């Protein structure tokens, strides 16, 4: 029993994954970003350019880039309604941040609008200077 507790303590001490809180800025089936991409935006200039591409003519949400950054996933074009992307979790391991996201697809039996959609999810997180990796979660 004592050995098991020691092994668990050593394992947990080496496991530095820490969940990162995030707040949704924008999430819908519509974006003017037509290509699939994942982004980590760290400057006001990058944010202005991305927002202008994503939602031209719409008010740009304020982000304090001295404290925060924006992370986003754009799926690119989909041939019908019913697609969605969701950032489901963000974890930090030292200087590396891993963003997990999931694409939700319509069921074969769903009745769908025949319209091209561009699903996206943009979130605000605490600023980091480390690498940001993206991992697509499988269903």
What are these regions (language model features)?
Residues 2-139:
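Exposed, flexible binding/inhibitory loops of compact, secreted disulfide-stabilized domains
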